[in-house]
Amino acid sequence: MSSMSMSSSSAPAFPPDHFSSTDQLCYVHCSFCDTVLAVSVPPSSLFKTVTVRCGHCSNLLSVTVSMRALLLPSVSNLGHSFLPPPPPPPPPNLLEEMRSGGQNINMNMMMSHHASAHHPNEHLVMATRNGRSVDHLQEMPRPPPANRPPEKRQRVPSAYNRFIKEEIQRIKAGNPDISHREAFSAAAKNWAHFPHIHFGLMADHPPTKKANVRQQEGEDGMMGREGFYGSAANVGVAHN
């Protein structure tokens, strides 16, 4: 046996009974005569490239002794066995399950990466049902929407409300001692007896019943400007 790293040694291939207890036993396959050779490698030649001569066909083989997997235990522990029996091949069903399992794992990893890229706010949950991998996307619980108070819409006051408000102010200005209830009743009567206000008619076109209203109500209240009721002691309001 010779080495290519500036060191050389020679040893023929002998049966395992002739090997030293300090040497390491490895096997070499001769591709010329298709023979497996048991070679004793000294500890100094480990992890080196050595030359082995086949004892069957005298062919020279160049072997790199650098793989621990090719080394067998020492000869003293080996006994009379030449090579350990190879492990039995796995059943075909197991191979198919391993292959399909590897494919499922790769597909699941790709789908998980794809889902996480497109749905950053969602969790990908893997479940197995009847031997099949199923993907479930569960959305993150979203925070409840903030309860905003309803916006109050400002309504435009109607013509009636504007008239009543202004009329109450006018009546109270003429008679500060009058109650708000009496002023409101007088303002309502003025609105009822002058229908031209409802239709937006000008004050220059008074209705024909204006004179009659003044005559009928002259005794019950004091007349104001434009025939409106002013403040008076008797405004036709029933007191409880």
UniProtKB/Swiss-Prot annotation:
Per the UniProt entry, what are the Gene Ontology biological process annotations, in alphabetical order? abaxial cell fate specification; fruit development; polarity specification of adaxial/abaxial axis; regulation of DNA-templated transcription; regulation of leaf development; regulation of shoot apical meristem development
C4-type zinc finger segments: 30-57
- Extract the CDD domains matched here: HMG-box_SF
Does Cell membrane show up as a keyword for this record? no
Keyword DNA damage (UniProt): no
One Pfam family this chain carries? YABBY
Q: How does it assemble?
A: Interacts with SPL/NZZ. Interacts with SPEAR2. Binds to LUG and LUH; these complexes promote adaxial cell identity in leaves as well as embryonic shoot apical meristem (SAM) initiation and postembryonic SAM maintenance.
Q: What does this protein do?
A: Involved in the abaxial cell fate determination during embryogenesis and organogenesis. Regulates the initiation of embryonic shoot apical meristem (SAM) development. Contributes to the repression of KNOX genes (STM, KNAT1/BP and KNAT2) to avoid ectopic meristems. Binds DNA without sequence specificity.
Spell out the protein name for this chain: Axial regulator YABBY 3
Q: What would be the name of the gene that encodes this protein?
A: YAB3
